[in-house]
Amino acid sequence: MKRKIIWSFALLACLCCLPSAKTKAQTKNAAIIPGEVWKDTDGNPINAHGGGLLYHEGTYYWYGEYKKGETILPEWATWECYRTDVTGVSCYSSKDLLNWKFEGIVLPAVKDDKKHDLHPSKVLERPKVIYNEKTKKFVMWAHVESADYSKACAGVAVSDSPTGTFTYVGSFRPNGAMSRDQTVFVDDNGKAYQFYSSENNATLYISELTDDYLKPTGRYTRNFVKQSREAPAVFKYNGKYYMLSSGCTGWDPNVAELAVADSIMGQWTTIGNPCTGPDADKTFYAQSTYVQQIYGKGNAYIAMFDRWKKKDLEDSRYVWLPLEFGKDGTITIPWRDSWDPRTQWEGQGDFSAGKGTFLLNGKPFVSKPQNCTIHASPRPIGTNASKCAKHWA
């Protein structure tokens, strides 16, 4: 009897050590390998195309186009407008920028209203999310389109949480002009701006947003007129503003261009292609979407690109690379076969962030926004912009 009891306890102990049927081992990534399949913590390929990052209270959130299902070319198409049905905007979260947890579809498609901007038959691209310190709202801006790309509008959604669900507010043409490839940027003083391709993608607009980040104030500038720039990605470094952008060659890659300005609404000057290494003249066969400063690591930034696969958009890949800053003021984005964001910036000086007080190498400091002069914007163009005859992906 005693032996039976001992064996029973031994069997129970073994059963307790076995993993539950509901428990799934998490996938751990060892490094970022640009252009290769990147899996989330559940072992599924990350699906967040044309997106951007948001850093909030110690966590990074990655938002992007959730492309699912068959990629099709409509029968009426006269250009390569490959598409998948709109599923929505996805969100992933991470502490280390390497291992990402799927948080779900935070802005889902609206399937029961064919006229809705988010109906599966429409187009939803380039979602970006910013946080409004005044309203405590998370605000999403995106490029929304009709199936034939004639709408050319910006769509806005809001949420009380970074993981949604976001409530769709509506769409419009900012300042009466077309809005396609776009991003949003919040300056140190809390002012937010939308950067977007307009005038049939010939000109890039910069539009100041209202204090709630929900619409334009009416102040904007026209930049790179008739130079056909798209896929803007904006960051601030050493007191200056930088914009990475792409040419307009459809789904095909082209050379990247970096521009710099002393103020967002001021003069932008192109300074060349920052990419170096194999296929740098093709932006590593990818296209810019966002640049994220890495909080807690000083002058550390990641440039995010999409490597589009036009006939299988769900399988489009991500190319993430760290920026390098030379002592002579140059900025480059060198190709890397693999790299680890957890160790990339070791020794650059760590920051520990708290509410109101920050630590720099263990010593408290307060970050105060500097006053900046914003030049009066050029005279606005008329609102009767012609419909788009061709969309460049």
Language model: regions and residue ranges:
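Carbohydrate-active catalytic/glycan-binding domains of CAZyme proteins
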Residues: A25-N361, T373
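Compositionally biased, low-structure terminal segments
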Residues: A10-A13, L18, T167, S352, ...
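Enrichment for repetitive, rod-forming helical segments
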Residues: F9-L11, E314, Q370
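Bacterial Sec-dependent N-terminal signal peptides
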Residues: M1-T27
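Disordered, acidic Ser/Thr/Pro-rich linker "stalks" and the adjacent N-terminal cap
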Residues: D350-W392
